[in-house]
Amino acid sequence: MASSEVDHEVREALLTCSQGHWFPVVRGIPRMLPDSLQEHWATVEPLLSRLPPDRAESVRGGISPDAGAYDRRTKENFSLEWDFHEVGDATWGIELDERVRKYLLDPIGVPRAELPGKVLLDAGCGNGSQSVAYTELGLEVIALDLSSGLEHGLKFLERRPDADPKLVHFVQGDLQHPPLADGCVDIIHSAGVLHHTPDTLGTFRRLCRVLKPGGTFYIWLYKREEGVTTVVDSLRKVTTRMRPATFARVAQVMAPPFQAFRYVANAVKWRAYPPTTRRESALALMDIFGAPHAHAHSFPEVTAWYEQEGFTTVWPCNDDRRGFGACGRLPAHEDASRPFAVVSTPLPGQRENDRQD
């Protein structure tokens, strides 16, 4: 059913599942959302001539304004945000190589020498920059995101000569309903994402099913800041009522005042904000004030989630003023009866990663 291939990569195709649903592959990316057929009909329609008439009619029957519920506003907000992002921009004020160390190598407690050949789900990959960088470690990466921002991942492949394009697979889909088989990945990485879904815990639970026995699941979430969270939440009651495109323009206008605020906060030693460009400041505003959902959590709360889902070990990481990280490991088959434990010190693999940086 593919209409074109480049270097053996399928660029345009139609996928179907056992339940008879159809999903298009557009520009090399499977689009696994309920309304993907409708959104990409200009690409889909020419492919129908390659199908038997009854199957082509089945595809046409999948076009419906009520194709299924998912968080469309979040998709629109983050699609705009990642479209505004440019290759070379820092994310959260942190350069790409530092993000790989801080939000993957340090937290997961897996020795770097053991990473090649493992499958990692980058759950909420954004523009795909980190997904691409992870292939340099020998990881096979499923880069999953609700937004269209993952289309920019190809730009990062061009900028990262050590990245392996055969090891990264971009998929547009909903983390609340991950289009993946049970027990298919070794590591799940989700930094700054789950709190932007309607139900953080529910999304966490649905992702757990795709993890293999012995697998590792790392998340980073917002936490409540005394006073600050209350002010931010009050402002969000206004900003999240704006159309995403309107607020994106507001964020660009407000970026210079936001930069000035950060400069003053640093000068009086109230905060230690990293330096950012005007565009990076606008992106931060879009993330903080534009996302429809922004839930705050705590490490003890999240520890209970891991225990409920059968993890035997969990440990804290990346604790800072805005949020915190947590990482847990499922038992291997032979360790299923191990008691649950919270580990407060770095694991051996984490120390090894530090030595190799």
Identify the role of each PLM range.
Residues 1-121, 125-179, 187, 294-295, ...:
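Conserved N-terminal segment of class I S-adenosyl-L-methionine
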Residues 186-198:
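A short SAM/SAH-binding and catalytic strip from SAM-dependent methyltransferases
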Residues 201-213:
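A short glycine-rich, Lys/Arg-flanked "PGG" loop and its adjoining helix->strand segment in the class I
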Residues 216-247, 256-263:
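Conserved class I S-adenosyl-L-methionine
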Residues 226-236, 274-294:
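Short, glycine-/aromatic-enriched active-site segment of Class I SAM-dependent methyltransferases
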Residues 293-309:
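Short alpha-helix
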Residues 312-316:
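A short linear hydrophobic-aromatic micro-motif
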